[in-house]
């Protein structure tokens, strides 16, 4: 169906609202996706963004991160608190919160006295924002270390941070989505997509973020690609068998003749 002038005007208006910070690249560019059966589940397939997973992104919190809110770079992406994915997520986190102590959680007294959860305007439960950021966020200068106290707890106990932090926190900036696919032979498979959590992943408000790292050149200088540096998180999201197959495909891509097909635009030139 041909697009009407009204539809085009509305689309243009929406585009005008998009905010891209100084060192960020645009959201729309060629990507190399690969689809493969889940080795551990015949009724499931993975669809993975190799452009993202072989990119050289890395977290630069505390070393160049500009933060999602202007003037609050020290908060990183923790300014709004974290929404729980479900009741199990909240219960899991609560078990680890119980082990936090004042020496590693700056707001321990406030959190234990007045609570560490809250509800947003729509009634969804989340970690409580306190003084402009997540209540678990230790501010610069705190003796126990700046940053997420749940992350600090995990490192102190020799755990992976994905064990102690809310789902959304440890998954960022990898995004997992699900879609049932109806095939021509009347069968169905669950398609699990693993890709980049860009500004759009936040919903309409994502375009209003002060800065976002996945498309920023300053956050694309890691020695290892994402599929290597995020191994624990990807294994948790995909299972060991699925991750192992992903590694094979990523290695095949990187071993191919340069330049790569559809490289991430924020990566260093020459890849």
UniProtKB/Swiss-Prot annotation:
Domain of life of the organism encoding this protein: Bacteria
Family per record: Belongs to the Rv0495c family.
Stated role: Essential for maintaining intracellular redox homeostasis.
Membrane spanning stretches: none
Species the sequence originates in: Streptomyces coelicolor (strain ATCC BAA-471 / A3(2) / M145)
Protein name according to UniProt: Probable redox regulatory protein SCO3349
Positions of the UniProt region annotated as Disordered: 1-21, 109-130
Residue ranges, compositional bias (Basic and acidic residues): 7-21
